[in-house]
Amino acid sequence: MSFIKKEPVLSAAAVLAVLSMFFVAPSPEYLSYIDFRTLALLFSLMTVVAGLKEIGLFRYLGSSLLAGMHSTRQLAFTLTALCFFSSMLITNDVSLITFVPFSILILNMAGLPELMIPVIVLQTIAANLGSMATPIGNPQNLYLYSSFGLSAGELVGYMLPLTVLSALLLVAAVFLLKNKAITLSRTSLHQDECPTKSSLIFYLALFLVCLGCVIRIYSWPVMFFIILAAVLIKDRSLFIRVDYFLLLTFVCFFIFIGNMERIPAISGLLTKLISGHEFPAGVLLSQCISNVPAAILLSGFTDAVRPLLFGVNVGGLGTLIASMASVISYRAYAELPEAKSGTYMMVFTLYNLIFLIIMCAAGWMLLSL
């Protein structure tokens, strides 16, 4: 029971996969359901980013940027921007895992507890929206990019207008925060040491190997072997940091969708229901089961990738579970002794609904052009 509470999405995906097996008996054809390229890319990126985090690169960059801040708005803007831009390369999950605890530390040291909730909420929104800009920003983008055979330029082009709008909205939201003078020095930040040059070059090189596969310079087995061999030699403990539950969730949904596609009556009905309604379907389904499984489920019954991308990325706004990355921020805040979880949820819901309404309107306008 505790596992179900901890991993509700994986549990639901596993149940759906098992139930679908009663209608389509297990066979070697199941292997054709699995998108091994997406799984290999996710695994490799999670491993390499774990290495970059382990050597302290992100905290070092963050503390370097924060040194010399003179106002609360400047501080809030920098902390929010860190999540917005870093999520484009290291995923929304890793961005929040790295910078939300870092922000809590900084705000406590600066004596600004009143900024804790609005800043963390804005960081969460920033990571979810910033991550939609690139193929590797979040799992749903990586999957749809791979599954639909998009080029990196196509995906970036599709998402650029919404990304620019979200950046402007975040700037406006930060500007509405109460401003006052502060002083943050390098000493007060306890700035992390710069990562060693050899480790930095090693992990950045591996990150470039991943990007090479993303833009299809070489096949995924080549990338997977290089990452596996290099990390085994350098630091095999990084394999423990990989989110294997996320990978299993993908596998379960692949099996469920593959089986549904082999049942003509169900496949035909779902295609009819979803076709032409990918954007609202993505937004609404994300509110209930989160945007990664929503992307996997809906992708099996439509060829319209642009509205689907819009739907599952904008759909990351709204409820706490609309994007599982949002849960990361909430847990980090809720663990604080002085946490006001009720207030957090009120602010989170208010900010998210405002962003969701504006982004949905923008999405509709872009799709109707």
Residue ranges with predicted function:
Residues V156-A167, P280-L369:
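C-terminal transmembrane helix pair
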Residues F36-T38, A67-T80, M109-V119, K197-I201, ...:
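Membrane-interfacial loop-to-helix junctions in multi-pass transporters
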Residues G111-N179, S185-S188, R331-A361:
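Membrane-core helix-loop-helix motifs of multi-pass transport proteins
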Residues A81, F85-L129, Y143, I296-F310, ...:
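Hydrophobic transmembrane alpha-helices that form the pore/transport pathway of multi-pass ion
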Residues M1-A13, S71-T72, C194-F202, M346:
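N-terminal membrane topogenic signal
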Residues F23-I34, L369:
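Short, hydrophobic transmembrane alpha-helix segments
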Residues L168-L228:
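Long, contiguous bundles of hydrophobic transmembrane helices that form the permeation core
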Residues Y33, I55, R59-G62, A205-D303:
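Transmembrane helical segments that form the transport core of multi-pass membrane transport proteins
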